[in-house]
């Protein structure tokens, strides 16, 4: 599969921002301490979240805030914002042997099922709101 760790870290970042945004200045350094990673990695992901309209970033006192209510942010929104591989979750072998009956037909035979799996995956991500995650913290 082609889902990187950025997705889970992005959800962690958004959850952290929501949890702390009214009580303290939420900076990339602060979030990095919660994620237990380098602030540079956090800033790279925040840049993608900001470009997707999920986060507002201000220098100084206010730090980061969510751009929208948590009830209107889905896991699909987060996934679409941070995953660099757009499109297919599964990669098919680009060069199956066209002279072999299996190689010649594997893309058609397998591709249909993988498309259905991906569609189901994306629909499930759209059903889960950031508020659902936050309610479990």
Regions found by a protein language model. Give the residues of each.
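Non-DNA-binding regulatory cores of transcription-related proteins
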Residues: 69-137
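Basic amphipathic alpha-helical segments that dock to polyanions
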Residues: 45-52
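Short alpha-helical segments that sit at the start of domains
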Residues: 1-14
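A short alpha-helical element within helix-turn-helix/winged-helix DNA-binding domains
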Residues: 26-36
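Beta-hairpin "wing" of winged helix-turn-helix
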Residues: 53-67
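Short coil turns linking two alpha-helices in DNA-binding domains
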Residues: 38-41
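Short amphipathic alpha-helical interface segments
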Residues: 13-22
């Amino acid at each position: 599969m082609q889902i990187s760790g950025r997705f889970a870290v992005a959800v962690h970042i958004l959850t952290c921002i929501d949890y702390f945004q009214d009580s303290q200045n939420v900076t990339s350094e602060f979030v990095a301490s919660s994620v237990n990673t380098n602030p540079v990695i956090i800033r790279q992901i925040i840049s993608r979240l900001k470009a997707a309209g999920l986060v507002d970033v201000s220098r100084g006192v206010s730090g980061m805030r969510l751009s929208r209510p948590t009830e209107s942010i889905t896991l699909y929104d987060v996934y679409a914002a941070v995953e660099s591989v757009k499109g297919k979750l599964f990669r098919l072998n680009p060069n199956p042997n066209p002279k072999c009956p299996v190689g010649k037909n594997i893309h058609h035979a397998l591709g249909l099922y993988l498309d259905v799996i991906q569609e189901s995956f994306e629909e499930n991500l759209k059903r889960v709101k950031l508020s659902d995650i936050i309610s479990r913290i």
